[in-house]
């Protein structure tokens, strides 16, 4: 490992220590709680939308969240390890076949929906059936 990779790994470990970053990807609906500073006041604002892509890696990783606000599409790019992000919560998992969902920008209404990924539950073991 060269010097730059070593320094990036140290910074990544330092920034990600004590914070929970859930596993999520394109198609997942997420709520990002962002710290907003207005004058001297600070508050947390929730931003809910569909993750349309992740880019970068390590300390430079970021993700893009798209939502429809008052009929207008709004996209916001968040650095994954930003100190302005209070928390990230995955609301639902989406079933998609692409890494970047930029095609959603041109879709409206029902065609822009993403089907939910079904979670496979383990089969219940019935006592006495294995005999």
Swiss-Prot record:
One of its GO terms (molecular function) is structural constituent of ribosome. Keywords: Ribonucleoprotein, Ribosomal protein. One of its GO terms (cellular component) is cytosolic large ribosomal subunit. The keyword rRNA-binding does not apply. It comes from the Bacteria. This protein is located at the 30S-50S ribosomal subunit interface and may play a role in the structure and function of the aminoacyl-tRNA binding site. Belongs to the bacterial ribosomal protein bL19 family. This is Large ribosomal subunit protein bL19. It comes from Rhodopseudomonas palustris (strain BisA53). The lineage of its organism: Bacteria, Pseudomonadati, Pseudomonadota, Alphaproteobacteria, Hyphomicrobiales.
